[in-house]
């Protein structure tokens, strides 16, 4: 065990603490994380419980849920992100001041969850904005979200001012807004280009960890191929196998059943 410098010990007794700029700045940021009051689906109910007195999130300085993105620095994406809602999520993220962080709460926000093969659900919010911490579960318990907050604090403690994207010394800080998609007739579009078609596969790769510069990984999780799903019910026959592309077999079977059900 290293011995404590007697000079430093004497200074601490007099109320003088020696530290670095990075450590002092990170201490201030991690001790005052203000989440945005923003919920999408059932995970938001667990997020509400997370903010109640039972879990005492005030211990970590994150008890002030703000109703405006201008006053928040943490977005908790709690719930299913539909393709119609995705542009609003990106717009809210762009309105948050730097430094800003994102926690993807639950299976739906992370990868689409049980609605992954649905025509209207985004397969992970990290396709559009960078995510700092992922919380698995459907839905995650408040304790899991509390652990995600602690994990985020640990990440903040390891940051250095000279390397984060939103701080620049000489060069311009990289604080540009992320492109806001538009929901068109064929799906999500960015700058007029289709990036996530309705009922199809996403054509853009997710963002890597913000600690690596928030660049896209360059790898598309699902290559653009024609998938032919088997139908679970042998009584259901597909006239065209391509009709089930991008749809789970159960959904395809149910859709076909509805078209042949008799009223009698």
From Swiss-Prot:
Q: Which UniProt keywords apply?
A: 4Fe-4S, Cell membrane, Iron, Iron-sulfur, Membrane, Metal-binding, NAD, Quinone, Translocase, Transport, Ubiquinone
Query: What superkingdom heads the lineage?
Result: Bacteria
- Cofactor descriptive note: Binds 1 [4Fe-4S] cluster.
Q: Which Enzyme Commission number(s) are on file for it?
A: 7.1.1.-
Query: Which GO cellular component terms, listed alphabetically, does the Swiss-Prot or TrEMBL entry include?
Result: plasma membrane; respiratory chain complex I
Which InterPro entries does UniProt cross-reference here? NADH_UbQ_OxRdtase-like_20kDa, NADH_UQ_OxRdtase_20Kd_su
SUPFAM superfamilies attached here? HydA/Nqo6-like
* Catalytic function, reaction form: a quinone + NADH + 5 H(+)(in) = a quinol + NAD(+) + 4 H(+)(out)
Topology of this chain in the membrane: Peripheral membrane protein
Which Pfam family, any one of them, does this sequence belong to?
A: Oxidored_q6
List the Gene3D superfamilies hit by this protein, alphabetically.
3.40.50.12280
GO-annotated biological processes: aerobic respiration; electron transport coupled proton transport
| Keyword Iron-sulfur among UniProt keywords | yes
Q: Which cofactor does it need?
A: [4Fe-4S] cluster
Compartment(s) where it occurs, according to its Swiss-Prot or TrEMBL record: Cell membrane
Tell me which residues bind [4Fe-4S] cluster. 42-43, 108, 138
What sort of enzyme, by top EC class, is this? translocase
Annotated TM spans: none
What does this gene product do?
NDH-1 shuttles electrons from NADH, via FMN and iron-sulfur (Fe-S) centers, to quinones in the respiratory chain. The immediate electron acceptor for the enzyme in this species is believed to be ubiquinone. Couples the redox reaction to proton translocation (for every two electrons transferred, four hydrogen ions are translocated across the cytoplasmic membrane), and thus conserves the redox energy in a proton gradient.
Q: Which PANTHER family match?
A: NADH DEHYDROGENASE (PTHR11995), NADH-QUINONE OXIDOREDUCTASE SUBUNIT B 2 (PTHR11995:SF33)
Its subunit composition reads:
NDH-1 is composed of 14 different subunits. Subunits NuoB, C, D, E, F, and G constitute the peripheral sector of the complex.
Q: Which family does it belong to?
A: Belongs to the complex I 20 kDa subunit family.
**Protein name per the record:** NADH-quinone oxidoreductase subunit B 1
Which gene is the coding source of this polypeptide chain? nuoB1
């Amino acid at each position: 065990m290293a011995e404590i410098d007697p000079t430093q010990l004497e200074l601490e007794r007099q109320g003088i603490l020696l530290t670095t700029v990075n450590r002092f700045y990170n201490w201030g940021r991690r001790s005052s994380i203000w989440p945005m009051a923003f919920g999408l689906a059932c995970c938001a109910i667990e997020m509400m419980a997370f903010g109640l007195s039972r879990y005492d999130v005030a211990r970590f300085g994150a008890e002030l849920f703000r109703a405006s993105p201008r006053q928040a620095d943490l977005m908790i994406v709690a719930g299913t992100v539909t393709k119609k809602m995705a542009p609003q999520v990106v717009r809210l993220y762009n309105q948050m001041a730097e430094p800003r962080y994102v926690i993807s709460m639950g299976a739906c926000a992370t990868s689409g969850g049980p609605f992954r093969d649905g025509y209207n659900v985004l397969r992970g919010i990290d396709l559009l904005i960078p995510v700092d911490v992922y919380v698995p579960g459907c839905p995650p318990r408040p304790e899991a979200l509390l652990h995600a907050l602690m994990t985020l604090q640990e990440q903040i403690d390891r940051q250095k001012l000279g390397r984060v994207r939103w701080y620049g010394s000489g060069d311009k800080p990289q604080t540009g807004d992320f492109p806001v998609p538009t929901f068109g007739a064929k799906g999500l579009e960015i700058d007029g280009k289709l990036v996530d078609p309705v009922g199809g596969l996403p054509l853009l790769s997710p963002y890597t960890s913000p600690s690596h510069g928030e660049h896209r990984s360059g790898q598309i999780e699902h290559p653009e191929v024609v998938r032919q799903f088997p139908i679970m019910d042998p009584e259901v026959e597909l006239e065209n196998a391509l009709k089930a592309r991008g749809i789970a077999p159960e959904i395809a079977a149910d859709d076909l059943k509805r078209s042949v059900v008799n009223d009698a």
